[in-house]
């Protein structure tokens, strides 16, 4: 039996990583075989790319940024995601191609189509069975981050993060069969329950 592929999206600080951890614990208790991955990263090569992308001292042009994300993604798909799905595992991925659509395509202004062409090569055309979008405001994201040191993307302007959120909401509306909108402003365990209710439908 083939596995499942579930991705999580949202602006920085929306709680993806926490909710993935909660979901992993829940699914392991149900007896499922789980692989948790993150983007950029998840492989030896990808983690090196991640260091470049998130280093606050680096100036990276929008096109370079798009290509670096795509290179990390290509390695992840071939080395980890496809083999895990073939082995019947449930892959929980913290960000995938939709992040590039909104961050580089929409917020950076490169255009969705340009990003799509590059990423169809990088992903070999695979898409998640379901994408869980956790929605919070940029104001809430900043509050949650608190005094933790921000990485290169987190240090972007207020307007940039507003555009990222707008981009996600457009994607949710454009691809309603794949995306599920989760209100991330709710209490932590209510968000977790909503996510479990969604995931159960795909298992």
Swiss-Prot record:
Keywords: ATP-binding, Kinase, Nucleotide biosynthesis, Nucleotide-binding, Transferase. Its EC number is 2.7.4.9. ATP binds at residues 10-17. GO terms for cellular component: cytosol. It comes from the Bacteria. InterPro entries: P-loop_NTPase (IPR027417), Thymidylate_kin-like_dom (IPR039430), Thymidylate_kin_CS (IPR018095), Thymidylate_kinase (IPR018094). GO terms for molecular function: ATP binding; dTMP kinase activity. GO terms for biological process: dTDP biosynthetic process; dTTP biosynthetic process; dUDP biosynthetic process. It catalyses: dTMP + ATP = dTDP + ADP. Belongs to the thymidylate kinase family. Phosphorylation of dTMP to form dTDP in both de novo and salvage pathways of dTTP synthesis. HAMAP family: Thymidylate_kinase (MF_00165). This is Thymidylate kinase. The gene is tmk.
């Amino acid at each position: 039996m083939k596995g499942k592929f579930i991705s999580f999206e949202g602006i920085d600080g929306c709680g993806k990583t926490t909710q993935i951890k909660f979901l992993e614990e829940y699914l392991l208790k149900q007896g499922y075989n789980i692989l948790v991955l993150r983007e950029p990263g998840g492989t030896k090569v990808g983690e090196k790319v991640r260091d470049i992308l998130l280093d606050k001292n680096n100036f990276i042009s929008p096109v370079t940024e798009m290509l670096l994300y795509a290179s990390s993604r290509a390695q992840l798909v071939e080395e980890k995601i496809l083999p895990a799905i073939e082995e019947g595992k449930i892959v929980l991925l913290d960000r995938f191609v939709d992040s590039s659509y909104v961050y580089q395509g929409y917020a950076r202004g490169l255009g969705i189509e340009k990003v799509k062409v590059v990423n169809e090569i990088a992903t070999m055309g695979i898409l998640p069975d379901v994408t869980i979008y956790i929605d919070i405001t940029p104001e809430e994201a900043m509050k949650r981050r608190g005094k933790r040191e921000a990485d290169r993307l987190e240090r972007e302007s207020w307007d940039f993060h507003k555009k990222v959120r707008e981009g996600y909401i457009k994607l949710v509306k454009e691809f309603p069969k794949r995306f599920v909108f989760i209100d991330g402003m709710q209490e932590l365990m209510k968000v977790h329950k909503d996510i479990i209710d969604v995931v159960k439908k795909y298992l």
